[in-house]
Amino acid sequence: MLLDPEDWSLAQCAPEVLESLPPELVDHTDGETHRSTLELRSDPHPDAGSLCDQLMSLRHGLAAAVTARGMRAGAAGLHGCTTWADTKVTESPRYDIVHDSMRVLARREPTFGLHLHVGVTDREEAVRLSNRLRAHLPILLALSANSPFWQGRDTGMRSARTPLFQGFPRVGVPRAFADYRDWVEAVDVLVRCGAVPEPSFLWWDVRLQPRFGTVEVRVLDAQTEVADTMALVALFQSVSRLELLEGHTSERLLDSPEALAENRFLAARDGMDAALLDPAGGRLVPARDVLAELMEACAPHAEALGCAAELALVDELARSSGADRQLSLAREGGPSAAMAGLARAFLAPPPSELAPAPSKPEASRPASRPPAAA
């Protein structure tokens, strides 16, 4: 998000910033639906360490371009003080379609998400991974929760972005697909009937990206610091390998769309303080216990992928999420102080141990060799 340091409101200057970017940033920066929003896009990376280096470089380049215009850059799931009346939308062919179809929904306050991709080798594997990742969306959301304020108020939610974005169609947890043909047939109905022009207008929490050869997770709030992004990247990559090689998740949970949807809400409301439904045991389980068990299962996969140092950062994120830090800043200075904190933390360096990992031999990777991309 782009911020005006005069009062930490949203700055409506994304098109002007895009025109002033240096060449090395042009291919990695895009406008979004709102004029206060820019998207940074990484390249695919074989390991989390090299991704971390690029994300820091992109943030420094963007911050310099934004600061040259007297503004600042920040990142979170929502701007906690803005209202729909303060926002301006972007004009482009794609976003004209969004605005025309979404009407007032597309003109409300912008939401900011972190979208992660993992590479897979074939379409059937992509469907299988997408199906199984649905069970892990609540934990990923709880860890990433970074939007407690909306229109200047404490919402009582750790991720208010989640229910706000739910107002859009074609969002939330997708159904399980039997195979790639089943996925194609489901999407084809929407395209042939004119509901969407192409599959990227499906904004599910996890979705296939056939043109990239990836599975994409979209449930996450944008992260204020790169270190938090790297923790989520490592967990996502490790969980993907775990599911592809071991099929870790309970089939009972995967077969319960009601439990998956409820866990998503609980994670958005309570973050890591949530208690999540366990259909197999017929009970609620603290999210911290779910995470502890998952971290233990992921540890050998993180070692194989070269992201063990990044995965270790998950523990700190579980103790203090972006939402927790915003709430702490707001206790003394109100929500606007939390927005100022987003700008201060935008270039916070990651821990020094997060150096690019050495290349791993192919035998140590799963058949899918999932690269990480943010």
Predicted regions and their residues:
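An acidic- and aromatic-residue-enriched active-site/binding cleft used to recognize and process polar
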Residues: 5, 43, 71, 76-81, ...
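Short, flexible active-site-proximal loops enriched in glycine and acidic residues
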Residues: 28-33, 66-79, 104-111
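Short, low-order "capping/linker" segments at domain edges
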Residues: 84-96, 155-171, 264
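Internal, well-ordered domain-core segments that constitute the primary functional module
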Residues: 107-133
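An exposed, glycine/acidic-rich loop-and-rim segment of catalytic or binding clefts
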Residues: 122, 130-177
